């Protein structure tokens, strides 16, 4: 009986050991952290592409699930409401025009400690783009992409006028005059110019003007040149060219010259595939001047998943994520170690000097800018009064 008991105990011990070994061999299920990611929509192509990029991230980071959703409607209003309710996404788009305001409101997480801890290098970002998201010496986001303006010209009309692509203000006016004289733009104007400071401000920079001294002779002369092209009959606004923006005016043949960003290229390909046009560097005068329209991925100050959010944010803006993002040509890389697809050189050469699109009291100031510019163009409001109004708005 004693032998039987010993045998039973021995078998039991073996069974326990086997169970323990099996339990140890069985991998524990890793904890999965869900990170929310949001931005505005720029069309189905861009939304679908971002989802593909996110899917690639999740495959290489199985412990992080990314819940990507598009915020429809007015993005700024929607995000402001979410900030107030403390339920903003973990990672989200921040337009350069809003970066300073949101950082000062304390709704964006400063990234300095994450950069230091992970030894993340920011050296490959174009400095002018990265600096757009620096406030008080702190980085509040990494630029996910960008676009400056370039000059797009209907090459058929340019050839019919016997002209070459202009490089300077004087040449621009000369080419436009030749187009007008020869009537190559039937039912339209040689140049499309929007009543929008997002198109006129580069001309101020090109003439040595600044927003800090927006009432200077240099700024005044730049505005007079811009508006003067319209007054001389060489240009007009999109609404006068049966268009809602200059891209449509160019594509439909109502204008031969436009000043738009990289976003024009996929639009022309899908909407006006038969229009022959070329993309040339932005016009210049005393100097090169351009705007950098850029958007960051930033982290919510209230995020409950900050480490996982940082992992996503830094990957999306790193070389692997950004290479995937710009692969379709919908945007330009904000990193010098990621190549843009072909045909973008006219945009990329603006990287060293393009200035971030944004300024103090952005929402109110931008409204004043464009309302006054419209009044200057349509009802003869004095340029000096517009610049005085803008100066006051900038100061708050």
PLM segments and residue spans:
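Short, low-complexity disordered leader/linker segments with a strong preference
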Residues: 1-36, 59, 336-338, 385-388, ...
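C-terminal lobe and pocket-closing loops
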Residues: 29-31, 116, 261-274, 283-372, ...
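Extracytoplasmic "Venus flytrap"
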Residues: 29-52, 147, 198, 356-362
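Short, well-ordered beta-strand elements
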Residues: 30-43, 64-69, 90-91, 140, ...
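Extracytoplasmic/periplasmic substrate-binding proteins
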Residues: 40, 58, 199, 224-305
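Hinge/lid segment of periplasmic solute-binding proteins
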Residues: 96-150, 173, 274, 279, ...
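Glycine-centered hinge/linker elements that transmit conformational signals in sensory
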Residues: 176-180, 212-239
